[in-house]
């Protein structure tokens, strides 16, 4: 058996091939797992659990079917879907996790997260993140009419795209000191995260020993998952 990790699907109605690929994954590989962890940015945008978008209901039903089959499903918020709430979690059968979670997997101590908090060189993004994660601001936003939230979200995505176009790739990647600090804080040898869309397995030193950072890929033209078993930790890419 294996525990599976995925992230950065950025599901939206404009990308039906990714949706179809995810549905096949849920109906196939996911059903064989000990557990499924989704490490953020499952959706391209999330403006509230009350959004009647048919895609959201379709995904909730598909994930719920995996959960009902006996495979526990867990979710860590990403920077795109940090407003995903308890209602959708209940409808999909997912358990919401904190932004950093330590797992004991087949004798390994593994830290999981979305990964955006590691990009500390991007001061502009970190300031924005701190602002939009304020509970009072989220409550205020979610109280707005749906059409207003849609307009605000569209403007924010446009602003983000424009800002990122002028940033260096190095700034938008993780900060090595932040990585080591997180791993040493939690006393782990393994870290699995997404966000950067740069799939790789990195070897480093943390806690005075060899450690590993595994970065999930985004689902653009193919699927990406990390498969953890008693024998191995694999970063796997597969066709939709």
Curated annotation (Swiss-Prot):
<dbReference type="InterPro" id="IPR029052">
    <property type="entry name" value="Metallo-depent_PP-like"/>
</dbReference>
<feature type="binding site">
    <location>
        <position position="8"/>
    </location>
    <ligand>
        <name>Mn(2+) 1</name>
    </ligand>
</feature>
<keyword id="KW-0997">Cell inner membrane</keyword>
<dbReference type="InterPro" id="IPR010138">
    <property type="entry name" value="UDP-diacylglucosamine_Hdrlase"/>
</dbReference>
<feature type="binding site">
    <location>
        <position position="160"/>
    </location>
    <ligand>
        <name>substrate</name>
    </ligand>
</feature>
<keyword id="KW-0479">Metal-binding</keyword>
<dbReference type="GO" id="GO:0030145">
    <property type="term" value="F:manganese ion binding"/>
</dbReference>
<dbReference type="GO" id="GO:0009245">
    <property type="term" value="P:lipid A biosynthetic process"/>
</dbReference>
<feature type="binding site">
    <location>
        <position position="122"/>
    </location>
    <ligand>
        <name>substrate</name>
    </ligand>
</feature>
<protein>
    <recommendedName>
        <fullName>UDP-2,3-diacylglucosamine hydrolase</fullName>
        <ecNumber>3.6.1.54</ecNumber>
    </recommendedName>
</protein>
<feature type="binding site">
    <location>
        <position position="114"/>
    </location>
    <ligand>
        <name>Mn(2+) 2</name>
    </ligand>
</feature>
<feature type="binding site">
    <location>
        <position position="10"/>
    </location>
    <ligand>
        <name>Mn(2+) 1</name>
    </ligand>
</feature>
<comment type="pathway">
    <text>Glycolipid biosynthesis; lipid IV(A) biosynthesis; lipid IV(A) from (3R)-3-hydroxytetradecanoyl-[acyl-carrier-protein] and UDP-N-acetyl-alpha-D-glucosamine: step 4/6.</text>
</comment>
<keyword id="KW-0441">Lipid A biosynthesis</keyword>
<dbReference type="InterPro" id="IPR004843">
    <property type="entry name" value="Calcineurin-like_PHP_ApaH"/>
</dbReference>
<feature type="binding site">
    <location>
        <begin position="79"/>
        <end position="80"/>
    </location>
    <ligand>
        <name>substrate</name>
    </ligand>
</feature>
<feature type="binding site">
    <location>
        <position position="79"/>
    </location>
    <ligand>
        <name>Mn(2+) 2</name>
    </ligand>
</feature>
<keyword id="KW-0444">Lipid biosynthesis</keyword>
<keyword id="KW-1003">Cell membrane</keyword>
<feature type="binding site">
    <location>
        <position position="195"/>
    </location>
    <ligand>
        <name>Mn(2+) 2</name>
    </ligand>
</feature>
<dbReference type="GO" id="GO:0019897">
    <property type="term" value="C:extrinsic component of plasma membrane"/>
</dbReference>
<comment type="similarity">
    <text>Belongs to the LpxH family.</text>
</comment>
<feature type="binding site">
    <location>
        <position position="195"/>
    </location>
    <ligand>
        <name>substrate</name>
    </ligand>
</feature>
<keyword id="KW-0443">Lipid metabolism</keyword>
<comment type="function">
    <text>Hydrolyzes the pyrophosphate bond of UDP-2,3-diacylglucosamine to yield 2,3-diacylglucosamine 1-phosphate (lipid X) and UMP by catalyzing the attack of water at the alpha-P atom. Involved in the biosynthesis of lipid A, a phosphorylated glycolipid that anchors the lipopolysaccharide to the outer membrane of the cell.</text>
</comment>
<keyword id="KW-0378">Hydrolase</keyword>
<feature type="binding site">
    <location>
        <position position="164"/>
    </location>
    <ligand>
        <name>substrate</name>
    </ligand>
</feature>
<dbReference type="Pfam" id="PF00149">
    <property type="entry name" value="Metallophos"/>
</dbReference>
<dbReference type="InterPro" id="IPR043461">
    <property type="entry name" value="LpxH-like"/>
</dbReference>
<feature type="binding site">
    <location>
        <position position="167"/>
    </location>
    <ligand>
        <name>substrate</name>
    </ligand>
</feature>
<feature type="binding site">
    <location>
        <position position="41"/>
    </location>
    <ligand>
        <name>Mn(2+) 1</name>
    </ligand>
</feature>
<keyword id="KW-0464">Manganese</keyword>
<keyword id="KW-0472">Membrane</keyword>
<feature type="binding site">
    <location>
        <position position="41"/>
    </location>
    <ligand>
        <name>Mn(2+) 2</name>
    </ligand>
</feature>
<feature type="binding site">
    <location>
        <position position="197"/>
    </location>
    <ligand>
        <name>Mn(2+) 1</name>
    </ligand>
</feature>
<dbReference type="GO" id="GO:0005737">
    <property type="term" value="C:cytoplasm"/>
</dbReference>
<dbReference type="GO" id="GO:0008758">
    <property type="term" value="F:UDP-2,3-diacylglucosamine hydrolase activity"/>
</dbReference>
């Amino acid at each position: 058996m294996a525990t599976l990790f995925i992230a950065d699907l950025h599901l939206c109605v404009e990308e039906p091939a990714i949706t179809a690929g995810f549905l096949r994954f849920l109906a196939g590989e996911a059903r064989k797992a000990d557990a499924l962890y989704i490490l953020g940015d499952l959706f391209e945008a999330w403006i509230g659990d009350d959004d009647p978008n048919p895609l959201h209901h379709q995904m909730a039903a598909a994930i719920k079917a995996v959960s009902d089959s006996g495979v526990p499903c867990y979710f860590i918020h990403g920077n795109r879907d940090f407003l995903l709430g308890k209602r959708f979690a209940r409808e999909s059968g997912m358990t919401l996790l904190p932004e950093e979670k330590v797992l004991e997997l087949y004798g390994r101590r593994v830290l999981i997260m979305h990964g955006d908090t590691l990009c500390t060189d991007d001061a502009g993004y970190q300031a924005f993140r701190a602002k939009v994660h304020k509970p009072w601001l989220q409550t205020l936003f979610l109280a707005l009419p749906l059409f207003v939230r849609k307009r605000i979200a569209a403007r924010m995505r446009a602003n983000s795209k424009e800002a990122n176009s002028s940033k260096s790739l190095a700034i938008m990647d993780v900060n090595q000191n932040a990585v080591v600090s997180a791993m040493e804080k939690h006393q782990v040898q393994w870290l699995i995260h997404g966000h950067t869309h740069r799939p790789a397995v990195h070897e480093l030193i943390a806690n005075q020993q060899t450690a590993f950072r595994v970065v999930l890929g985004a689902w653009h033209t193919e699927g990406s998952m990390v498969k953890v078993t008693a024998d191995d930790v694999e970063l796997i890419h597969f066709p939709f």
